[in-house]
A protein has these predicted regions:
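Glycine-rich phosphate-binding loops of nucleotide-dependent enzymes
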Residues: 2-251
């Protein structure tokens, strides 16, 4: 088996008496698409922050492509090949869609001149935003802003893409559109870790799913097997249909 693209080795993080990651060990293989689910407060956002460098674990180590990056700051991890989105898109609203991606190509991927321009246009083509290239980001719909958030992350030329609740707030047809974008990126060989409450979007996209609760891994495996796990179903009791644990959404 190839060396993991990402490996978390016994990572622990606490805020006062609240532990958001407890000796958590997790690996992602090159080109793998992993979905992460769990109730609010499960430690999902903290996990992403430790992978991206926005948060440093109290103990344990984070490895990327065989190199320990536990103490590496976020901008350096981006340059190393880790791209991420945020739950609330915050593009440069006064810049066009193209300019938003171009900034990421310059600053995140270190691309210059024609290479940066070509890369940015390719990213817009791949995320369905080419027709909006000259549109100011402040005029975009929510779905378009979500697409731009993904495009900005892809603009940094990552080998690992962290998606943080990108389907949240979208209508079902919009979720379907976004899933197609993510699927396309995955088929190009990009490693993906996707946190999402709209779980049926994950089922249609990822090959593996992890459920977190209280900073621990509760279940890890094929998506439908994880969602059928009694421990996982207990966590989601009363969660409503948006949890994606119904047969209709899981099909």
């Amino acid at each position: 088996m190839a060396s993991p693209l990402l490996h978390l080795d016994g990572v622990t993080k606490s805020f006062g008496k609240v532990t958001v990651a407890r000796e958590l060990t997790l690996s992602v293989q090159p080109g793998e698409a992993l979905g992460i689910v769990g109730p609010n407060g499960a430690g999902k956002s903290s996990l992403f922050a430790m992978i991206s460098g926005d948060l440093r674990p109290d103990s344990g180590a984070v490895w990327f492509e065989g190199r320990e990056v536990t103490a590496v700051p976020p901008h350096a991890r981006t340059r190393a090949g880790v791209g991420r989105t945020y739950q609330v898109p915050r593009p440069f609203e006064h810049l066009t869609v193209f300019e938003n991606v171009l900034v990421c190509a310059h600053q995140g991927a270190g691309l210059k001149g024609r290479q940066a321009w070509t890369h940015s246009m390719d990213v817009l083509d791949g995320t369905g935003l080419a027709d909006l290239a000259n549109t100011p980001a402040g005029r975009l719909t929510l779905l378009q802003r979500k697409r731009l958030e993904v495009a900005r992350a892809i603009g940094t030329a990552p080998r690992l893409l962290l998606l943080d609740e990108v389907a949240g707030g979208l209508t079902e047809p919009e979720v379907v559109e976004l899933v197609e974008v993510v699927k396309r990126l995955h088929t190009e060989g990009l490693g993906i870790v996707w946190i999402e409450h709209v779980v049926h979007a994950l089922v249609k996209t990822v090959g593996r799913m992890v459920c977190l609760a209280g900073g621990d891994v509760v279940a890890d495996g094929e998506p439908m097997a994880v969602l059928a796990d009694p421990k996982v179903r207990e966590l989601y009791l009363g969660g409503g249909p948006e949890t994606g644990l119904t047969d209709e959404e899981g099909s």
